[in-house]
């Protein structure tokens, strides 16, 4: 009589190794309630998840104007996701509404002010530039790097992608070659729908759930809900996908942080939707 212990043991070991290799999906909810009697709130989100990237959730209210400066060797990205206000950069005022992106670029200091009786919430994303980033930055078009980049998400260029359904509206809110190795966009649809499983080991990725977002994110054998106003890190190299149930909303920002400039070839999978001639 044959003993099946080696086979059973082998299956057990494979299953155990798969479990050990499965990476949890880090996600952190962003509180939209300021502490009592406070007019300013700042918290580091998903600390040390991505090398060279520091993310803060900042909330402002009240009449005071806040000054913010870019540290040497860094570039800043502001993603405004709730509330209204104004950013002033070199004497120019930029109206801030929910779902606006702003990059100071060569402007060293900006002023932020909240609209009366409102609270402004945003992510402040600092990217530490490597020596190669500094070299690459010099080759970028000057119009990309010397002026403030400011866009409302709805004004940004739409694109299609094979992993998404025709019902999905995708937009590039920050093209590459503005800040080295970074690009950002949005994904918006109503369920039932999905983003098909895919892998991109050449980049780190964050998702920011926008208003009413209510989806499930899968990465290898793990899954987690992603709700509105939450930040999630896709485990590097994982096969990941997103689903949304009937009558629910999928609406999030993807943020790509490429390991090197060669990885930006991935963006060629995005097919720009040409505007029809009027």
Which residues fall in each region the model found?
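Double-stranded beta-helix
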Residues: 117-161, 245-278
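Bacterial Sec-dependent N-terminal signal peptides
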Residues: 1-24
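Conserved metal-binding segment of the jelly-roll/cupin
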Residues: 96-115, 226-246
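Conserved hydrophobic/aromatic beta-strand scaffold that supports enzyme active sites
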Residues: 55-59, 77, 93, 101-103, ...
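A short, N-terminal "cap"/entry segment at the start of jelly-roll beta-barrel domains
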Residues: 22-54, 130-190, 278
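A short beta-strand-loop-beta hairpin characteristic of the jelly-roll/cupin
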Residues: 69-98, 204-228
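Sequence termini and other peripheral, non-core segments
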Residues: 23-38, 43-47, 51-57, 65-77, ...
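Conserved short histidine dyad/triad with adjacent acidic residue
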Residues: 54-71, 183-200
């Amino acid at each position: 009589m044959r003993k099946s212990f080696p086979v059973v043991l082998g299956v057990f070991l494979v299953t155990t190794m798969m479990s050990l290799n499965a990476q949890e999906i880090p996600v952190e909810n962003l509180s939209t309630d300021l502490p009592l009697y406070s007019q300013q709130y700042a918290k580091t989100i998903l600390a040390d998840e991505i090398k060279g990237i520091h993310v803060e959730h900042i909330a402002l209210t009240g009449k005071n104007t806040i000054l913010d400066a870019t540290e040497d060797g860094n570039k800043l990205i502001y993603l405004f996701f709730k509330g209204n206000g104004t950013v002033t950069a070199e004497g120019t005022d930029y109206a801030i509404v929910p779902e606006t992106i702003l990059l100071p670029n060569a402007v060293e200091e900006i002023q932020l002010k909240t609209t009366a009786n409102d609270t402004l919430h945003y992510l402040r994303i600092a990217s530490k530039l490597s020596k190669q980033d500094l070299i690459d930055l010099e080759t970028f078009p000057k119009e990309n790097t010397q002026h403030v980049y400011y866009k409302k998400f709805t004004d940004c260029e739409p694109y299609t992608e094979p992993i998404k359904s025709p019902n999905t509206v995708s937009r590039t809110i920050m093209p590459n070659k503005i800040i080295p190795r970074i690009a950002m966009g949005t994904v918006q649809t109503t369920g039932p729908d999905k983003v098909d499983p895919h892998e991109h080991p050449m980049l780190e990725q964050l998702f920011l759930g926008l208003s009413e977002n209510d989806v499930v994110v899968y990465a290898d054998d793990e899954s987690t809900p992603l709700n509105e106003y939450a930040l999630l890190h896709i485990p590097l190299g994982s096969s990941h996908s997103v689903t949304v149930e009937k009558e629910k909303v999928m609406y999030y920002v993807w943020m790509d942080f490429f390991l090197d400039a060669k990885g930006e070839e991935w963006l060629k999978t995005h097919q720009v939707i040409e505007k029809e001639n009027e």
